Amino acid sequence: MLLAAVLMVVVIIKRARRRLNGAATKRIRSMIERADRAGEPVLRVLEYDKVLDHLLLELGFTGTTGQKMIKGAARFSNKQALWKCHKLRNLVAHEHGATVSASEADHFKRVLEKALLEVSSRS
């Protein structure tokens, strides 16, 4: 019984990593660079949100992007900004005719990069 409890704790700790390793950080930075080339601001926002989802997945969180953000919110000092960016993505994904300015897309990128910096290994 004790062994099962210890194993469960180890699995939970491994699933919700504290920091991303260098390889994971590099993959996510590469995804951000690809998202930069998506062109129109609305497309960049959609791509940046996919990167956010992948970042949360790499940290060990599961579910929809929103569920992952709820589980991982405490990990980020800019959690409110991350939520605002995800809500912008939801707006453009679900509202016909929704538009995004270049500055809004650029803001999403900056928020995402700050979040990545906070959870990346310091090496």
Predicted segments with their positions:
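Amphipathic alpha-helical interface elements
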Residues: 1-72, 76-80, 106, 110-111, ...
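Broad hydrophobic/π-residue packing in well-ordered secondary structure
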Residues: 32, 94-98, 112
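Histidine-centered, metal-coordinating catalytic motifs and their short helical/loop contexts
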Residues: 75-102
